[in-house]
A protein has these predicted regions:
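A non-catalytic structural micro-motif
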Residues: 83-91, 106-137, 150-158
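Bacterial N-terminal signal peptides that target proteins for export
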Residues: 2-11
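Pyridoxal 5′-phosphate
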Residues: 16
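Periplasmic peptidoglycan-binding/tethering modules of Gram-negative envelope proteins
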Residues: 24-85
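A generic structural micro-feature
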Residues: 144-148
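C-terminal motif of bacterial Sec signal peptides marking the signal peptidase cleavage site
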Residues: 19-22
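Short beta-alpha junctions and helix-cap segments that line functional grooves
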Residues: 139-142
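Extracytoplasmic/secreted proteins, especially bacterial periplasmic and envelope-associated proteins
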Residues: 66-73, 99, 107, 111, ...
Length: 158
């Protein structure tokens, strides 16, 4: 039963990767300021001036102070744009097994979802998708690359 769930999740992630990779745009450069990434290189940038991603410590899904502030800004924007739905993509760095990182990415995306819901954003407007370590923003194998890859990204779904 557990193997079926893992295989189902792996299949869903693969399909999602294929669908989203067909929609990919060219990446723009960004930089880290504390634990906030200031780039806008997602499929669709959430909103001008509002960061689209939050970052996590190694093996953690606990939101930092900076991450909570970013999500608060996202919630404000989402309240003003009540017809918008979003996908929260959970990611992990390359270390650890594929299964572990898929679960960790899901916990990270759910942490962001739970926080947005405390600001009145309906769960009906938020989908969660974990990519684990399958979609790194930085393919390096070093602490800086890993810190960029431990993230949850908010993507506009409609």
């Amino acid at each position: 039963m557990k193997l079926n769930k893992i295989l189902k999740n792996a299949f869903l992630v693969t399909v999602a990767c294929l669908v989203l990779s067909a929609c990919a745009t060219s990446k723009k450069s960004g930089q880290m300021q504390g634990d906030v990434y200031t780039g806008n290189d997602t499929v669709e940038y959430l909103a001008s001036g509002v960061p689209d991603r939050v970052f996590f410590a190694t093996n953690e899904s606990v939101l930092t102070t900076a991450s909570r502030e970013t999500l608060r800004k996202q919630a404000t924007w989402l309240r003003k744009n009540s017809k918008i739905t979003i996908v929260l993509e959970g990611h992990a760095d390359e270390r650890g097994t594929r299964e572990y990182n898929l679960a960790l990415g899901e916990r990270r995306a759910n942490a962001a979802k739970d926080y947005l819901m405390t600001y009145g954003i309906s769960s009906d407007r938020i989908s969660v998708l974990s990519y684990g370590k399958e979609r790194p923003v930085d393919s390096g194998s070093n602490p800086l690359a890993w810190s960029k890859n431990r993230r949850s990204v908010t993507v506009k779904a409609n």
